[in-house]
Amino acid sequence: MSEINNENLEPTSSTVAESTESKNKHIRSALRKRRGKLSAQTYEEDQEAILSSPLLTSTPKTVSRSLVRLYPYLIVVDNFLSIITWSNDNVSANLLGIFLFTVCVLYFGFITRYFGHLMIVGIIWVYLLIDKHVQETMASCPSLDDIIHVMDRVSMKSSAVLSPITILSAQDVRRLLFTIAFLSPVYIFLTVFVLSPNYLMLIGGLYVLTYHSKLIRRMRRYLWKFRVVRLLVFFITGLDLGGPDNNRRLFASVNKKIRSFVWNEVGNTSNTKKTVLFKVALFENQRRWLGIGWTSTMLSYERASWTDEFLNTSPSPEVFTLPEEQSGMAWEWHDKDWMLDLTNDGIIQLPASAAKTKVKPGADEGFIYYDNTWNNPSATDTYKKYTRRRRWIRTATVTTTYDDEPTVEKATPNSHALKSEENNRVRKRKVSFSTANEVHIIPSSDSSKLIQISDVSMSPSL
């Protein structure tokens, strides 16, 4: 009887499976190399199964068909963006692209005059090579999951390419247009007497092609440390592009609190020196991308790759600098290097005998893992975790010397508005490097005299 009952119950499951199989067989081999016209009938007639994806059961037929048609173009765009972002394994392709661009810009007239007819054949030959590469890629990665991975890579690389533009607001664009228009006489002088338009186009193109290379990134980071370079960029573009000194306002507000603290503690004593110890904390944020792994590339609407405790954008430890000595305030680092907090501010429990900090940690040490929305923290990495962060700390000291009582204004909206209006009347054009609204200095655990500063309102100008 039990066997008879089982035979009566199982046909339902088998019928569902056959129905699902019949729905999916027209897209199972959608990524196979095809000949002839690509149409809906081609999908229906194709009966050969190569490698199906579990996503086929939940993806509508029209969506799958559109993704299949889009896949070859995604492969081409992905390879092109890999060259632009220098994220490919073959650096020779980048160098070849730079060489061809240089030759085309400098000798475009000569090439078109004597080899224009051969250029047409060369373009067709390049197209055939690209088509062959696309077909090989489709044959080696013939599933719907591979299409999704390529789409993720294209999205991430496109965000990286457009990141210098997407950060600009409408007001920034208007300011840039006004500044560039104001500098038109300088541009005309350069193109007429110094450099021809071809050379200017060559310089601009090479800058774009090498913008994401490691060497150029390091050169920009090194040059950006010089205030002259930052001011030059500001006067050319009219934009506040931030940089290593975008924590200047942060320290300006901290200086005010220190002046008030020292005055209240030591009283009216001339030439009084006071050393205050601070522990500065930076948080490194990363996101997991399918097919790539953990990277510092974040979504456009979420926190930056480096932030402070309040999620304000912060420079990375390599470019984080203390302010220069001014107004009786002398800042200097107490620790030699930045150290990773292996406990992540006490969240990760370590044995009592284990070290709590590390100067050169591993790539995966000290992280707290979260889900896709930065919730549900955990000390272990699982397949449900897509974001993570860890804490870097470094101790700094500030020595103060005062002869007179400092004037510390209360941080009220009215006082800030009045002060901003006065500064706008008299101040000259200068650069501001931060838009942070809060300062939080985490006190050290040493026995020295410490201060905790939080929720400090920023002054509108330095």
Curated annotation (Swiss-Prot):
Start-end of Polar residues biased regions: 1-19
Modified residues (Phosphoserine): 432
One of the Pfam families matching this protein, by short name: Pex24p
GO cellular component, one term: peroxisomal membrane
Transmembrane segment boundaries: 91-111, 176-196
A GO BP entry: regulation of peroxisome organization
InterPro entries per record: Peroxin/Ferlin (IPR006614), Peroxisomal_PEX28-32 (IPR052646), TECPR1-like_DysF (IPR010482)
Residue numbers on the Cytoplasmic membrane side: 1-90, 197-462
Residue span of region Disordered: 1-26, 406-425
Sequence similarity: Belongs to the PEX28-32 family. PEX30/31 subfamily.
Note: Present with 238 molecules/cell in log phase SD medium.
Name of the protein in its database record: Peroxisomal membrane protein PEX31
Source species: Saccharomyces cerevisiae (strain ATCC 204508 / S288c)
